[in-house]
Amino acid sequence: MQLWVGLGNPGPQYALHRHNVGFMALDTIAEVHNFGPVQKKFQGWLQEGRIGTEKVLLLKPATFMNESGRSVGEAMRFYKLGMDALVVFHDELDLAPFKVKVKQGGGTAGHNGLRSIDKHLGPDFLRVRLGIGHPGHKDRVTGHVLGNFAKSEQDDLVDMLGAIASEAALLAKGDNVLFMNNIALRQQTAG
């Protein structure tokens, strides 16, 4: 069993923020793979389903970004999962918009959701980095991250989320390189 976590902030006012692209990824995966109903558990929203042959739990912490680790830690302990079962989908400033990269472990790069998970569980988990691009100057980062995707970006956003969901079985079985390559190919074809 695997636990896939999408990072974001709860509430409709945050739903379309770049910072919530992790939530968006999980919502798309749940829809494409016909996951079960949403349950309120572990200080978040949990859905159960299968991706390929793997049982996968999707968790969106409802704790706000800075406390995501509380929710994730609670779920990991309840299901007695090792760190190799944890996959975290998050927005990444230092990646071009709509690029997808998988990375094992590492630092938090100033991301408060990753910092919280690191604090509660340690750094050794798989990250699916979802590029939102950098606004160019550090003074504009907060407004960029907490801003909505522009109308002109919607097609690229939908293409990225759809590609992630379509290729999710590769991620579930640990074929991270093919997962990334196939997403990039789908995006080139869509563009």
From Swiss-Prot:
PANTHER family: PEPTIDYL-TRNA HYDROLASE. TRNA binds at residues 14, 64, 66, 112. InterPro entries: Pept_tRNA_hydro, Pept_tRNA_hydro_CS, Pept_tRNA_hydro_sf. This is Peptidyl-tRNA hydrolase. NCBIfam families: pth. The record marks 9 as: Discriminates between blocked and unblocked aminoacyl-tRNA. Belongs to the PTH family. The gene is pth. Keywords: Cytoplasm, Hydrolase, RNA-binding, tRNA-binding. The active site is at residue 19. Its EC number is 3.1.1.29. It comes from Novosphingobium aromaticivorans (strain ATCC 700278 / DSM 12444 / CCUG 56034 / CIP 105152 / NBRC 16084 / F199). The record marks 91 as: Stabilizes the basic form of H active site to accept a proton. The keyword Glycoprotein does not apply. Its main location: cytoplasm. GO terms for biological process: protein quality control for misfolded or incompletely synthesized proteins; rescue of stalled ribosome. Signal peptide: none annotated. One of its GO terms (molecular function) is peptidyl-tRNA hydrolase activity. Hydrolyzes ribosome-free peptidyl-tRNAs (with 1 or more amino acids incorporated), which drop off the ribosome during protein synthesis, or as a result of ribosome stalling. It catalyses: an N-acyl-L-alpha-aminoacyl-tRNA + H2O = an N-acyl-L-amino acid + a tRNA + H(+). The keyword Isomerase does not apply. PROSITE patterns: PEPT_TRNA_HYDROL_2 (PS01196). GO terms for cellular component: cytoplasm.
